[in-house]
């Protein structure tokens, strides 16, 4: 099935690209999420009339992501206290939601889906360098310091 992308989709294409995808992917994900429309003549004409508006919206999203990246750079690091044993092993773990919550409390609005933990949840006390994926084209590094609170 051919679709016209209404925004940039990772590993697929950018705004306005006409791409061939599996029918289920288009019907169950891209179209319901508003990321694409099926490539019919009517939709192509409608897309061409809205292209400038969609490009402006995409540019605004990138601008917001860049401002957020600058705010993260100004912040530098975030400290998350967690209960830990004497060896530095945490009771539980620090996950993406905990990191997003700590960043939001520090003044930078981040969703948990934007925090990527390549090696899984943090289970030890220490400093970790993470990358926050704010937009498909904008990533921001952040240092997360997990401190232990002994019981």
Curated annotation (Swiss-Prot):
SUPFAM superfamilies: L9 N-domain-like, Ribosomal protein L9 C-domain. Gene3D superfamilies: Ribosomal protein L9, C-terminal domain, Ribosomal protein L9, N-terminal domain. GO terms for molecular function: rRNA binding; structural constituent of ribosome. It holds the Pfam family Ribosomal_L9_C. Keywords: Ribonucleoprotein, Ribosomal protein, RNA-binding, rRNA-binding. GO terms for biological process: translation. One of its GO terms (cellular component) is ribonucleoprotein complex. NCBIfam families: L9. Belongs to the bacterial ribosomal protein bL9 family. Binds to the 23S rRNA. This is Large ribosomal subunit protein bL9. It comes from Nitrosococcus oceani (strain ATCC 19707 / BCRC 17464 / JCM 30415 / NCIMB 11848 / C-107). The gene is rplI.
